[in-house]
From Swiss-Prot:
Region named Disordered: 1-33, 447-471
Main location: cytoplasm
Native source species: Danio rerio (Zebrafish)
Protein name: Cilia- and flagella-associated protein 157
Coiled-coil ranges (or none): 27-190, 225-369
Single GO MF annotation: microtubule binding
Function (record text): Specifically required during spermatogenesis for flagellum morphogenesis and sperm motility.
Comp. bias regions, Basic and acidic residues: 23-33
Biased composition (Polar residues): 451-471
Subcellular location: Cytoplasm, Cytoskeleton, Cilium basal body
Family listed: Belongs to the CFAP157 family.
Keywords annotated in UniProt: Cell projection, Cilium, Coiled coil, Cytoplasm, Cytoskeleton, Differentiation, Spermatogenesis
Length: 471
């Protein structure tokens, strides 16, 4: 170490300068006492630092245990979470596969049903179009026939009404004719009777008159009788002609009635056939209506299948989203675990660093204790020369300085210049916590019963001046 090299140089200089003055020997003796006090203060400071580092080491050990337990818990939780996420993911994947298979089956079934429905629909549309065209033409034909039939029906009704009116009129005329014939016959009979009577009377009167005036006016009476006979004959001829006309009208009405009956016999089968065709057309229309309803139900089924397919697609997207969320959660948990592991590694490194520093401090303390023991046990004998005593003290001082320089190099102890500039009350600070070690536990210095702050200033200055002189 560099302090040891300096110690060798100082020892060589002390050997070369064999004769020193008595004042220097007295200063050396005083330096020994001051060095003891300085080193005792240094040891107390190191013990206090050791207490703090021991307390910090205990705290770090407790933190390490807590962190190890937390790490175990986190790892266990991670394993549980990973296992749960794997199980959930497996279930979701199984469910997703089942849904995908169901979706594919539904799609295949839907495609097959759609193709069959489309073929059936096209066939039905073609049949419907053909039937529509056929029935449209038939309806047009039937409409024409129906129009003609309606016209014929109206004509028939008109003719029937006319027939009825003519029959009524004929009946009335017949009754009138019969009554008139009866009246005429009755009148004719009565007239004949009356005429007979009148003629008989007239004949009688005429005969009487004729007898009376036969002699006087025979030609005039004959002429008047002939005229009366001609007038009666003309009246009878008129009645006969009128009767013939009525008989002709009666025959014409009967012929019209027979013609109407023949026409009615012809139109009734045609009307019956048209009625049958109309009923058949109504049945076909009902069948087409049923087929349309069936097609509408099939279309509704297709719509429902499409809705089910859309719902399956929505469920599939929701499951994919949930799986993605689970993956993100798994990644977040893994990242948290990695951060926790990094924190644990950092704490472990800090703990190792503290342990290493603690070991170095213990080494420095052991070296200081050994040096102090040697310094305290090294009692100068009377036969030793002052040069040997001085050399031995210089060697002890070099060892102690080397120990202090090592502690200062580690950053765990004050350097000599720091001790010269530190305040007297700086060493009065003690740890606020309890520790495993207290001042005097090493057995090298007495336990602290009073404050040494009043002595540190002079001790530091005397040690520093002594070291400068030896240098």
């Amino acid at each position: 170490m560099p302090p040891k090299k300096n110690g060798k140089k100082n020892r060589d200089q002390a050997i070369k300068t064999g004769g020193m003055e008595e004042t220097e020997q007295k200063n050396a003796e005083e330096l020994t006492e001051s060095d003891k006090k300085f080193y005792q203060a240094q040891i107390r400071d190191l013990e206090e630092r050791l207490e703090r580092y021991q307390l910090k080491c205990d705290e770090l050990e407790v933190q390490e245990k807590d962190l190890s337990s937390k790490i175990n818990n986190v790892e266990k939780e991670k394993k549980d979470i990973v296992l749960f996420l794997k199980r959930t993911l497996a279930k979701k994947e199984d469910k997703l596969n089942d849904l995908a298979e169901t979706l594919s089956r539904h799609q295949q079934a839907q495609e097959a049903e759609r193709e069959s429905f489309e073929s059936q629909l096209s066939l039905l549309r073609r049949e419907l179009q053909e039937n529509k065209e056929k029935y449209t033409s038939e309806n047009m034909t039937l409409a024409g026939k129906l129009a003609s039939l309606e016209e014929f029906s109206t004509q028939r009704e008109t003719l029937i009404a006319e027939r009825r009116s003519l029959e009524e009129q004929l009946r009335k005329q017949k009754e009138d004719h019969q009554a008139e014939i009866y009246n005429l016959e009755k009148k004719a009979v009565l007239d004949n009777d009356r005429l007979k009577k009148e003629m008989l009377q007239h004949v009688a009167t005429v005969a009487a008159e004729f007898r009376r005036v036969s002699d006087e006016k025979m030609p005039e009476t004959t002429l008047r009788a002939m005229q009366e006979n001609l007038s009666v004959t003309a009246q009878l001829q008129q009645l006969s002609e009128k009767t013939k006309e009525l008989l002709k009208e009666n025959d014409a009405l009967r012929a019209r009635e027979r013609q109407l009956k023949r026409e009615n016999g012809i139109t009734e089968p045609l009307l019956h056939e048209i009625t049958k065709k109309s009923v058949a057309n109504q049945k076909v229309v009902l069948q087409l209506t049923e087929k349309c309803k069936q097609m509408q139900s099939e279309v509704e089924k297709c719509t429902k299948l499409k809705q089910d397919h859309q719902e399956l697609l929505d469920i599939h997207s929701a499951v994919c989203t949930e799986i993605e969320d689970l993956r993100k959660k798994h990644a977040a948990v893994t990242e948290d675990l990695n951060q926790t592991k990094a924190e644990v590694e950092r704490q472990k490194k800090e703990l190792e660093e503290e342990s290493r520093m603690r070991a170095q401090i213990n080494t420095v303390l052991e070296e200081a204790a050994v040096a102090l023991k040697e310094a305290l046990r090294d009692v100068p004998e009377e036969e030793d020369s002052e040069l040997k005593v001085t050399v031995r003290r210089s060697q002890m001082m070099q060892k102690l300085l080397a120990v202090l320089d090592g502690a200062a190099a580690l950053g765990k102890g004050p350097a000599l210049t720091d001790l010269m500039t530190c305040r007297p009350g700086a060493l009065q600070k003690t740890s606020p916590h309890l520790s495993h070690y207290k001042t005097g536990d090493l057995g090298l210095v007495p336990r602290k019963t009073h404050s040494t702050s009043t002595k540190m200033g002079n001790l530091s200055r005397s040690a520093y001046t002594s070291l400068q002189k030896k240098a």
